[in-house]
């Protein structure tokens, strides 16, 4: 197999993506589908799922609130019924969490962020590992954030979960290596899209500056002076599912244009 051939994802992969009906998750799903994978997405939003089914006929799309352990378990029953197994789990579902000082964040906001961004990733991994052990190309991919390598003032719950995801990934890579399961994390930087627009808007309102000025402040944090796209993240995700990445595990890979600070 040539080096170029090794860059192509393994054919026919069975891929499950949490939070896969919109945003980065949808772009990841589209990329895997284009590469010939069998894709199952779950998402909390029924309108997003309906739009996904219309856009990608023949795919499996399941409604699930990832804060509910029983609903996550149900996703894996669907996975087994439709695909008979799993090769790649993309642990993608997450929320932005509150924006504000630590003294202004409520316990409920903190717990909600931890539950969706961290506990759900553990629960998905818990159910996925038996299936991944039966796969010849088992890969567990956690979507974290550049906030998982930098401090992030005013976004403490979010940053705390992303650091924890990296720790989860590192531990699972050591634990599952002998089963030939690779475990990695992608750390997207400041990603263009509605979610980031909301973060910028909230921060601008909080400090009392125009939204355009706050947007430029965010761009100034990036060495390349541009935000990344969901397609940038998807391209790296596909690489990690290729023979070229067969010895890549335990890595927290930044796709961020070199964010210098947050």
Residue ranges and their predicted role:
Residues 2-7, 96-99, 150, 226, ...:
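Short C-terminal tail/terminal secondary-structure segment
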Residues 145:
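Residue(s) in the substrate-gating loop at a strand-loop-helix junction
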Residues 130, 174-178, 246:
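Alpha-helical segment proximal to the catalytic Tyr-Lys
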Residues 125, 161, 169:
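Active-site helix of classical SDR
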Residues 100-102, 106-114, 218:
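Substrate-binding pocket helix/loop in short-chain dehydrogenase/reductase
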Residues 85, 177, 182, 248-250:
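Short, small/polar-rich loop/turn modules that mediate ligand/substrate recognition or access, typified
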Residues 7-40:
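Canonical Rossmann dinucleotide-binding motif of NAD(H)/NADP(H)-dependent dehydrogenases/reductases
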